[in-house]
């Protein structure tokens, strides 16, 4: 398979916006690199510091329309203008196992309340903690991205004991697995990417929770719900993008139990108002419904309680 890479250089304050725009344009993965020679020292737990100047590299499938050179050139100018990129360029690359290529960059991450994400090739720094053992494979959700951490932090604050959870847009399965390790009874994980369904099942097995997690493509989950009398969902985690979140609001409401909880992520600051309007008919949003990670100024988290 042929691949194209779009490279953008911008200031760190615009990295989150650039990531969101690259994902919306069809990027399959995004890598961040130092644009200069600036050292980063050991961060505090939960922090992910960035260099002052960052090079973002979005990987596109060249066999799709979004990955053709002329399309990338076209939207690269639009993205560059929005994030004030100092330079952009496009390069062609050979097929590689990109997650394995970047394996050396992964390290254990400490989240809130003694929750750790540990790559499966490394030893947990704290064996007594709640450790999520992950191999991200080709699916989104390593724990490094701000949207994942925002959801993980929220999960550690919830009463998940014996709860039924949906992880919608599950990626690697990290959020659903975290919910199970934090006490949930059962998780239904859903993603549009077959690779994500595979990665979720594999990661669930690594964490010995595969007997309490079922992963589906959306159409298969719909059929499953029609054929099975599944219990009403008590907690929903949806870490995707603003546009699908807005469209899914009525559907999510049909799955929820009375007074169930929901968290939405994958939003940048300018998108929260539209998403809030879509969910207010069904959910009482928390007073501090827009939470911004200190080190990731653009990414937002919305949460609330089902009122149906």
From Swiss-Prot:
<comment type="function">
    <text>Methylates ribosomal protein L11.</text>
</comment>
<feature type="binding site">
    <location>
        <position position="169"/>
    </location>
    <ligand>
        <name>S-adenosyl-L-methionine</name>
    </ligand>
</feature>
<dbReference type="GO" id="GO:0032259">
    <property type="term" value="P:methylation"/>
</dbReference>
<comment type="similarity">
    <text>Belongs to the methyltransferase superfamily. PrmA family.</text>
</comment>
<keyword id="KW-0808">Transferase</keyword>
<dbReference type="InterPro" id="IPR004498">
    <property type="entry name" value="Ribosomal_PrmA_MeTrfase"/>
</dbReference>
<feature type="binding site">
    <location>
        <position position="191"/>
    </location>
    <ligand>
        <name>S-adenosyl-L-methionine</name>
    </ligand>
</feature>
<feature type="binding site">
    <location>
        <position position="148"/>
    </location>
    <ligand>
        <name>S-adenosyl-L-methionine</name>
    </ligand>
</feature>
<dbReference type="InterPro" id="IPR050078">
    <property type="entry name" value="Ribosomal_L11_MeTrfase_PrmA"/>
</dbReference>
<dbReference type="InterPro" id="IPR029063">
    <property type="entry name" value="SAM-dependent_MTases_sf"/>
</dbReference>
<feature type="binding site">
    <location>
        <position position="239"/>
    </location>
    <ligand>
        <name>S-adenosyl-L-methionine</name>
    </ligand>
</feature>
<dbReference type="GO" id="GO:0016279">
    <property type="term" value="F:protein-lysine N-methyltransferase activity"/>
</dbReference>
<keyword id="KW-0489">Methyltransferase</keyword>
<dbReference type="GO" id="GO:0005737">
    <property type="term" value="C:cytoplasm"/>
</dbReference>
<keyword id="KW-0949">S-adenosyl-L-methionine</keyword>
<keyword id="KW-0963">Cytoplasm</keyword>
<dbReference type="Pfam" id="PF06325">
    <property type="entry name" value="PrmA"/>
</dbReference>
<protein>
    <recommendedName>
        <fullName>Ribosomal protein L11 methyltransferase</fullName>
        <ecNumber>2.1.1.-</ecNumber>
    </recommendedName>
</protein>
